Amino acid sequence: MKVTSKCSMTMANIAKPKEWYDERIAYLSEFMLPERFATMQRVVADRTRYMTVCAENTFHPQNASALVRHCEAFGVQELHAIEFLCGFQANLHIVRGTDKWVDIKRYGSTAEAVAHLKGEGYRIVAATPHTNDMTPDSFDVSKGKFCLVFGTEKQGISPEIMEVADEFIKIPMYGFVESLNVSACAAILIQGLVEKLHCGEVDWRLSPEESSELLYRWTRESVKDDEGILRKRFGEDF
């Protein structure tokens, strides 16, 4: 599994005490506009890993880009990309930098992605009509963490995902159209389910430790010569 991030992930993957991150955040914030840092603090407070998204072999860059933007806009911190048929390639003109704020985890097979997600305690929720499907209104977000899986543009959800899915979800249709494209479907489902989390009693936010680790990475993304600054002040070895 590969993790995509502009900022070096080496230190982020090592467990550090919350105080370690907070000390460096406080120092780096001195090199930022106060308004910018306040915005980051606000956004981190609304981030979640309780819900995540998985894209299976997304061919079109515009759809990959839209998925990244949807996740960022609605506070979903992680996006999982299965890439055994094609790479998950976002269009820079569409994402407009939002990929800096979302962690994209990449997998070479569906089995690898499912094993990781199941190992992290996620329910696999396939976005496709099914005999036992649910709608955003009827889906129970309180049953535990869940991952929304979106299939490829033409074939939809793969047989491998259909076999291991814990639940299925669809968007009710009332016209002649029987389906929406990946981007539209993702926007509706992600927004609807995030709204349910915000309105419910589920503890969906990041832990204090996760929030500090993420804010540390974001402040590093936003400060020029962050490595030099941290090395000079804290003696960091990158």
What do these predicted ranges mean?
Residues 1-238:
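Post-transcriptional modification and biogenesis factors for structured RNAs
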